[in-house]
């Protein structure tokens, strides 16, 4: 009994008053199986409650998204707004904010869009969707909040020497390589995934062999940091050229494979719509996470001029990454 916190005991007593007969109430509740059953009941009910709210959020999102793609901003806004009560339980709340703002803009409700953008800036300054909206440049206060949050983020940098060398060889920016390594392996050079991807940039052996043949480098372990990073950088540079510098598509290809991304045709919408329509949840999460990482590393780059830090987009022509169209020196 003494091991149970007082707050929990009070809650259990309240529940007991409603579900346990009067003659069985009292301290006996905190001994043996009755206590265990009550705690289990609370946990199960809480999980069901949370699941129900999140399911409602997902349902509202899907209905709103179908309306958005059909060109009906009013219906999309109605569905997304209907789920606002559930936002505290929805890990995708920043996404709802972003698309509600887009819908409000389409409907000419600029003041409401500004209010939503202000809330988004204060609540989710480091989220991918906030950074994406900041990149549009329509809300200076949001851009400033996102830039400030990026500069204040304590994102560690590791393997800088190896990353700089790979960047020089392949033309991929140091900040992009840092962002990918962070997401792929959390800077663990010994990381091996369940699918067999190895090292800092999580290369599959056959992908590594292709990259080795391009840059004429072999014989080293994929867990060698310098070797792994330069191979991964070469692979990413090739994907970036294949998809004509489209950053979200290149990142999606790095995660899911170039063949898969080639099947995901771009419709009439923009890059944000394309990201939302990526069929694989893991790849959607990956693309958003790496772009966020890249934005933060770019904002905190010691080589970046201080006066440029408040400017968004952090990467040129939102969604595009400049990598030399020519083959890198490592591939000649």
Task: Please tell me what each predicted stretch does.
Residues 27-29, 41-43, 332:
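Catalytic-site microenvironment of enzymes
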Residues 68-81:
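Helix-turn-helix repeat elements of alpha-solenoid scaffolds
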Residues 35-48:
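Hydrophobic membrane-insertion alpha-helices, especially the h-region
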Residues 104:
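Soluble catalytic regions of membrane-associated enzymes that act on cell-envelope
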Residues 1-30:
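N-terminal Lys/Arg-rich, disordered targeting/topogenic segments
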């Amino acid at each position: 009994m003494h091991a149970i916190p007082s707050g929990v005991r009070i809650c259990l007593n309240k529940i007991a008053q409603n579900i346990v007969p009067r003659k069985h109430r009292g301290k006996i509740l905190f001994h043996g199986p009755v206590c265990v059953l009550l705690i289990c009941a609370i946990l199960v009910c809480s999980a069901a409650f949370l699941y129900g709210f999140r399911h409602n959020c997902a349902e509202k999102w899907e209905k709103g998204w179908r309306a958005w793609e059909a060109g009906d901003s009013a219906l999309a806004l109605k569905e997304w707004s209907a789920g606002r009560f559930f936002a505290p339980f929805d890990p995708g709340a920043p996404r709802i904010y972003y698309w509600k703002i887009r819908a409000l803009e389409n409907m000419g409700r600029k003041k409401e869009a500004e209010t939503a953008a202000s809330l988004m800036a204060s609540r989710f300054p480091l989220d991918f969707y906030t950074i994406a909206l900041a990149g549009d440049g329509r809300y200076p206060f949001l851009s400033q909040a996102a830039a400030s949050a990026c500069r204040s983020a304590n994102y560690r940098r590791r393997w800088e020497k190896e990353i700089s060398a790979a960047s020089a060889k392949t033309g991929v920016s140091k900040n992009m390589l840092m962002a990918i390594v962070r997401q792929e392996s959390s800077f663990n050079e010994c990381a091996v995934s369940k699918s067999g991807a190895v090292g800092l940039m999580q290369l599959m052996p056959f992908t590594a062999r292709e990259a080795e043949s391009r840059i004429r480098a072999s014989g080293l372990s994929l867990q060698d940091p310098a070797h792994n990073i330069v191979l991964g950088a070469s692979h990413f540079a090739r994907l970036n050229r294949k998809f004509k510098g489209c950053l979200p598509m290149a990142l999606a290809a790095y995660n899911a494979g170039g063949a898969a991304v080639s099947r995901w045709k771009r419709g009439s919408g923009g890059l944000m719509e394309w990201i939302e329509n990526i069929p694989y949840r893991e790849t959607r999460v990956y693309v958003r996470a790496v772009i966020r990482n890249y934005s933060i590393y770019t904002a905190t780059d010691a080589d970046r001029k201080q006066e440029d830090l408040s400017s968004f987009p952090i990467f040129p022509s939102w969604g595009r990454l400049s990598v030399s169209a020519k083959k890198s020196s490592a591939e000649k």
